[in-house]
Amino acid sequence: MTDAQTPSEDLPQLQVNMQYIKDLSFEIPGAPHSFIEMQGKNPEIPIHVDVNVGNVGANAYEVVLHLKIEALLDGKALFILELAYAGVFTLNLPEEQIHPVLLIECPRLLFPFARNIVADMTRDGGLPPLLLQPLDFVELYRARAAEMNAQQGQA
């Protein structure tokens, strides 16, 4: 370490400490009849995404990626999958960079693992594996920021 460096410069800026399934639920409410009803049909599959962050220690944060997927056919649920996939991250960054990294980069790192869990759960549930397309966490961050600004403007 040179005189110009500080100890924090030697530390990784972003460290993944652990990843885990915080909550997982999968159900096929109409089975076995729903398997017959969906033959040759393409259900509507809306995907709801949310990211929550909590501080768990000095520079350590839990980031939880929430996915709720409900396959619908003629207004009836074929399957419902809810996943909360979390990671604990240590950040050694300037204060102004922490919030965007927690809500953009950390969920981007978690997403491939959550995507794999979704594919495995649907396949193991007797359905074709649902392969989620990549998510744009930058756009989600911008939408969330715009929503918060609108709420603050109304207050």
From Swiss-Prot:
Keywords: Chaperone, Cytoplasm, Protein transport, Translocation, Transport. The lineage of its organism: Bacteria, Pseudomonadati, Pseudomonadota, Alphaproteobacteria, Rhodospirillales. Gene3D superfamilies: SecB-like. HAMAP family: SecB. Homotetramer, a dimer of dimers. One homotetramer interacts with 1 SecA dimer. Belongs to the SecB family. One of its GO terms (biological process) is protein tetramerization. It comes from Paramagnetospirillum magneticum (strain ATCC 700264 / AMB-1). The keyword Protein transport applies. The gene is secB. GO terms for cellular component: cytoplasm. InterPro entries: SecB, SecB-like_sf. Coiled coil: none annotated. It is found in: Cytoplasm. GO terms for molecular function: unfolded protein binding. This is Protein-export protein SecB. One of the proteins required for the normal export of preproteins out of the cell cytoplasm. It is a molecular chaperone that binds to a subset of precursor proteins, maintaining them in a translocation-competent state. It also specifically binds to its receptor SecA.
